[in-house]
Amino acid sequence: MRNGHFITDYHCHSTVSPDGHNTMREMAEAAVRLGVDDLCFTDHIEPLPWDRWNEPPREKHSYDWTAMLAQFREAQEAVGDRIKLHMGAELGECSFAPDVADSFLDDAPPLDFTIGSVHCYRTASGEVNDLTWITSTDPAVWYAACESYFEEMEKLIDWGRFQVLGHITLPLRWAKELHGVELDFDRYEEQLRHVMRRAIEKGLGIECNTNRGHLPLPDGKWLRLYHELGGELITLGSDAHTPEYISCAMEARQELLKDCGLRYFATYDRKKPIFHKI
């Protein structure tokens, strides 16, 4: 417990991820120091070659789970019963090569939790671009990318082999942080409404990504919409890639959920949700 709150973080990365900086042990030990009760590792599992999205998809059954398992066991041994640790994955870009993603999951060890996420979009010429590759400050360029972003999210929901949708308003982060571009997501209300409704119908949740204490993804307006549509399944994750951001702003985001009408947030064990009253 921290400040009267049960603290969880269901989105963090270790050196198992290509963009991670610290081992699972280091992240888990930091979480203990920060008063986290339940930490789930969600390292990147991608069917496309990392940061080379336009190359052919990876070979089926080519993901090696060995490093993840080894690091997770080391972290468990280091922290003992001082914190609950869960092993999950962030399944990125699976809409672009679902058959490869299927093969990775078919070979996977027992996972507690998976996030389905989109970081890329298709250009007008059909290339796969990462949102972080956009160099323009023209909002029109970003809005064009957003149209494709939501199309990929629809395909991701159709695929559906995960528990929650991650950071569904991610373009807001990169447009602002990289180039100071303020996007108006009100123009995507119908797309977001449709995405949320379809996720609810399929029994999938959404993530409230605390974004390291910056703009939550999604923010209050869209969390209220999720609640109004009947959504109840929501997790909290920092998206920490380094120890100092683990569980960042979790108390404030729990209060945000409550203000938006949501009464619970979820943790997972072997892909089964456990609900915690706010």
Residue ranges of model-derived segments:
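An N-terminally biased module of ancient metal coordination in phosphate/nucleic-acid-related enzymes
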Residues: M1-P98, L105-D106, L172-D186, H241-C248, ...
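Charged catalytic cores and adjacent phosphate/nucleic-acid-binding surfaces used
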Residues: M1-S14, M24, L178-I278
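Short hydrophobic/charged patches on amphipathic alpha-helices used for structural packing
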Residues: A28, M153-E154, L223
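Low-complexity, flexible helical/coil segments
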Residues: D43-L48, Q76-A78, Y121-E127, S148-K155, ...
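Flexible loop residues that form catalytic
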Residues: H44, H119, L170-R173, N211, ...
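Extended substrate/RNA-proximal surfaces in nucleic-acid metabolism proteins
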Residues: H61-E201
